[in-house]
Amino acid sequence: LIQNLVSYLVQTRKFTVLDREYLNHMNSELNIITTNQTNIEEIVKLGQKLFSDYIMVGTLQKLFTEEKTIKIKNSNNSVSSKKAFIEFSYRIIDVPTSQIMFSDDYTGVFDIEEKDIVSLEGYIIEKASLEIGSTILNAIYPLRLEKISGDTAYIGQGGLEIVIGEEFTIIELGEKIKDSYTNEYIGREQKEVGKLQITQVSAKLSSGKIFQQSYNL
């Protein structure tokens, strides 16, 4: 599951993901550099590469399948169905402040057609990682319009997150809203001003045609 999440988050081009294998390798290089009394600038450069902005911690709580067979009334025939269930709890922690940026208890339920599946476990994990990865991405980096030219809008996100033909509502952000108790910034005013349909997707950028708007965007 973790490796699938890593692959998903990397292809979004929004995250540089450091895994344990990478960190162990970099720590070994750092030890070599410091032992050989290398220039301090090189040590600083390498040290900077080891720093991460966020840490994800999670627990896979459940992963199982369930099969049900229903007998058709007044017949000797029956119909079987199989579903997969997965539960995964996780948190995204901001390293500098130790604050929990986002947390979620994910539950996935998937219909299974085994004739089309090579690895059942791999199928469940792949489906779940796409949904979890999308939730993480939208929580930390929500989709934004980077540019509007005529009736074409450009979104600063591509990859697996955006699909040609998909439709989105365009939201205009207003004044900031603060929690009256903590004085913490909790969001902004939102106003629906249009809709667009995706026409093109690349690794970093997507574009779509605006087919509905409240005013000339």
Language model segments and positions:
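Amphipathic beta-strand/beta-sheet edge segments enriched in Tyr/Trp
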Residues: Y54-F110
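N-terminal segment of the mature soluble domain
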Residues: L1-T59, V95-S103, V163, I171-T182
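C-terminal soluble interaction/assembly domains
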Residues: E167-N216
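C-terminal/domain-edge helix-coil "capping" segments
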Residues: K83, R91-I155, L160-E167, V201-L205, ...
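Solvent-exposed loop/turn segments at secondary-structure junctions
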Residues: L23-H25, K62-T65, G108-D111, K176, ...
